[in-house]
Amino acid sequence: MAWTKPIIREIECGMEINMYGPDSDEEREVLF
C-alpha cells in the first residue's frame, strides 16, 4: 500500500462507502 497521494482518495472512498453501507465500513477498517 502506498501512503502518498492515494491516501486522500482512500479516505474519500471510505467516507462514501461508510455513507452507503456500514457493512463495507467494517471491511475498510480491517484494510486500514
From Swiss-Prot:
Cited Pfam families: PqqA
Pyrroloquinoline quinone (Glu-Tyr) cross-link, chain position(s): 16-20
Keyword set, alphabetical order: PQQ biosynthesis
Pathway(s) the chain acts in: Cofactor biosynthesis; pyrroloquinoline quinone biosynthesis
Domain of life: Bacteria
BP terms from Gene Ontology: pyrroloquinoline quinone biosynthetic process
Protein's job: Required for coenzyme pyrroloquinoline quinone (PQQ) biosynthesis. PQQ is probably formed by cross-linking a specific glutamate to a specific tyrosine residue and excising these residues from the peptide.
Similarity-based family: Belongs to the PqqA family.
Name the record gives this protein: Coenzyme PQQ synthesis protein A
Organism from which the protein derives: Dinoroseobacter shibae (strain DSM 16493 / NCIMB 14021 / DFL 12)
